[in-house]
């Protein structure tokens, strides 16, 4: 075994051990006690002033932010008058993700418990007109059945109950978490593992957040290389877009900080490798996926594209290499470096961007284009997943870009026998040359794609909630990445000096913790549950007063954990 191979084996072993400690295959996540001790809720004297600087909109505080939602629901749980609204909210969410055969019974339970004036949890705040519609006759079980009730419930909770919450201890606890969230957590909070790959401006490596044990991927953008290649604008665009998107089908940005040499983006780690690797390298004698597996990934990609397009973001770089698998076998789209955000009032954009073979005809011809280019790329990606080759060139075929452009614009696509009629029809609808006729994002949704016969057996509600079993689960003992010596190293950048403008850009880029992913990490790793300590008598907890846990013996018997 040569030194390079030995280096890979050692690095893989350390990475797999860390991964096992976090994903549950070992008993306790690996946490650094020194950094764990720094995750401490502050006394109110340090954080109460945040009340004046935070955006206190109901939707943001109580629905979008994970810790905010938990604390608001705990507040509702503590007051009997709010229990009907809370339980209805939770039961509707439960109904929306239930198996089809369980929905009828759950629907009847909702009608009986919350819409009957004689019921203990009758929701008297609901408009009589909404209630009457559900009492007119037999209820037809369907997706979104109780959305009017949910919207009315949240509208009610956003009024007087929300104002009560803002004056409660639970909101003060939220301010404590927001203060902690804002504390700088930079390079020293992370332990680097092996290099996973290379980006345009630096390496991508696995890393571990020391305090929680959570694993991430750290994309390092070398400052000198960025400046030399005039990459500042592209890097900032990618970072700002990553901060805007929060979907289980798109990699999330959790932290952004700088080191002496690099700008660092700490993002969701996808341990299963990319789709291209699985198409061609896992079973080389029979490349490609069975159709059900390809359809599962396609459905998850559709959910990711819909999230981007609802936020007016054109992806422009969908391809198998940019679709990554997580530990459980679910996929997310990644690498938003070529994405562009449409401005208010702007319906289309222009510019040559993407990967040869995946770019839509209108883009190749220099025309203006919209989100439709991403659905053309989806068609190419689905075709490649099933056929193990692209629709416009055979695997390994050397094709000049001019010829490839001609094929995409002018030639029909041929489908091998691997395609069912439904998958062929779906691909053809995506690979339509005319963007106006192409299947895609319409009326702010991807519902027309969801309604295609190809997905007739797919439960979209459960897919979107992350409740469906993926068709393939990556091996937890395998590192789906090139050997370290095959990743390659960057050459040293010389002759680049930084000035005040550069320093200001670096500081603007390094914004620290991203609220929603950071809060998800605190909940997922158990930190929230460990610090969310309340007195059973309802009085102010010691941490809010600035009293450490070990210094107040009088209140020990009155403490309880609420996660």
Curated annotation (Swiss-Prot):
Autophosphorylated, Ser-21 is a minor site of autophosphorylation compared to Ser-491 and Thr-492. Phosphorylation at Ser-21 is regulated by light and activated by cAMP. Farnesylation is required for full activity. It holds the Pfam family Pkinase. The active site is at residue 317. Its main location: membrane. It is linked to Night blindness, congenital stationary, Oguchi type 2: A non-progressive retinal disorder characterized by impaired night vision, often associated with nystagmus and myopia. Congenital stationary night blindness Oguchi type is associated with fundus discoloration and abnormally slow dark adaptation. PROSITE patterns: AGC_KINASE_CTER, PROTEIN_KINASE_ATP, PROTEIN_KINASE_DOM, PROTEIN_KINASE_ST, RGS. The keyword Repressor does not apply. GO terms for cellular component: cytoplasm; photoreceptor disc membrane. It is found in: Membrane; Cell projection, Cilium, Photoreceptor outer segment. CDD domains: STKc_GRK1. Retina-specific kinase involved in the signal turnoff via phosphorylation of rhodopsin (RHO), the G protein- coupled receptor that initiates the phototransduction cascade. This rapid desensitization is essential for scotopic vision and permits rapid adaptation to changes in illumination. May play a role in the maintenance of the outer nuclear layer in the retina. Residues 456-521 form the AGC-kinase C-terminal domain. Coiled coil: none annotated. Residues 190-455 form the Protein kinase domain. Residues 1-189 are annotated as: N-terminal. The keyword Membrane applies. It comes from Homo sapiens. This is Rhodopsin kinase GRK1.
């Amino acid at each position: 075994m040569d030194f390079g191979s030995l280096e890979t084996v050692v690095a893989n072993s350390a990475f797999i051990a860390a991964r096992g400690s976090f994903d549950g295959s070992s008993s306790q996540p690996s946490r650094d006690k020194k950094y764990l001790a720094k995750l401490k809720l502050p006394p109110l004297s340090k954080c109460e002033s945040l009340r004046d600087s935070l955006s206190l909109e109901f939707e943001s505080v109580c629905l979008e932010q994970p810790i905010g939602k938990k604390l608001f629901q705990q507040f509702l749980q503590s007051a009997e008058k709010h229990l009907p609204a809370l339980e209805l909210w939770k039961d509707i969410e439960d109904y929306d993700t239930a198996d089809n055969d369980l929905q009828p019974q759950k629907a009847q339970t909702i009608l009986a418990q919350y819409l009957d004036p004689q019921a203990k949890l009758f929701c008297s705040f609901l408009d009589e007109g909404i209630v009457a519609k559900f009492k007119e006759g037999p209820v037809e079980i369907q997706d979104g059945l109780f959305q009017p009730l949910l919207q009315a419930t949240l509208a009610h909770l956003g009024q007087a109950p929300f104002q009560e919450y803002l004056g409660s201890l639970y909101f003060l606890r939220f301010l404590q978490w927001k203060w902690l969230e804002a504390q700088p957590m930079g390079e020293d909070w992370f332990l680097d593992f092996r290099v996973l790959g290379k980006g345009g401006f630096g390496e991508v490596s696995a890393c571990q957040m020391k305090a929680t044990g959570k694993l991430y991927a750290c994309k390092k953008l070398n400052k000198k290389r960025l400046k030399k290649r005039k990459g500042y604008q592209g890097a900032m665009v990618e970072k700002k877009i990553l901060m805007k998107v929060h979907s289980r089908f798109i990699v999330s940005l959790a932290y952004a900080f700088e080191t002496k040499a690099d700008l660092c983006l700490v993002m969701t780690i996808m341990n299963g490798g990319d789709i291209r690797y699985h198409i061609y390298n896992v079973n080389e004698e029979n490349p490609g996926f069975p159709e059900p597996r390809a359809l599962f990934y396609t459905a998850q990609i559709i959910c990711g594209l819909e999230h981007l397009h609802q936020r007016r973001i054109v992806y422009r770089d969908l391809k198998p290499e940019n679709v990554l698998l997580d530990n459980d076998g679910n996929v997310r789209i990644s690498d938003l470096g070529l994405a562009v955000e449409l401005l208010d009032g702007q319906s289309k954009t222009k510019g040559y961007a993407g990967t040869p073979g995946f770019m839509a005809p209108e883009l190749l011809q220099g025309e203006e284009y919209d989100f439709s280019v991403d659905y053309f790329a989806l068609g190419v990606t689905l075709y490649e997943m099933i056929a193990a080759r692209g629709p416009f060139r055979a695997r390994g075929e050397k094709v000049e870009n001019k010829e490839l452009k001609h094929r995409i614009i002018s030639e029909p696509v041929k489908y091998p026998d691997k395609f069912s009629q439904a998958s062929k029809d779906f691909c053809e609808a995506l690979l339509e040359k005319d963007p106006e006729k192409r299947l895609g994002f319409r009326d702010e949704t991807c519902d027309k794609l969801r309604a295609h016969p190809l997905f007739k057996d797919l439960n979209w509600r459960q897919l979107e909630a992350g409740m469906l079993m993926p068709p393939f689960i990556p091996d937890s003992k395998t590192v789906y990445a090139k050997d370290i010596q095959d990743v390659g190293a960057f050459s040293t950048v010389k002759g680049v000096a930084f000035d005040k403008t550069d320093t200001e850009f670096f500081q603007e880029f390094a914004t620290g913790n991203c609220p929603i992913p950071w809060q998800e990490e605190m909940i997922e790793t158990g930190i929230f549950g460990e610090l969310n300590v309340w007195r059973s008598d309802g009085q102010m907890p010691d941490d809010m007063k600035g009293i450490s846990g070990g210094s107040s013996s009088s209140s020990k018997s009155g403490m309880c954990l609420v996660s």
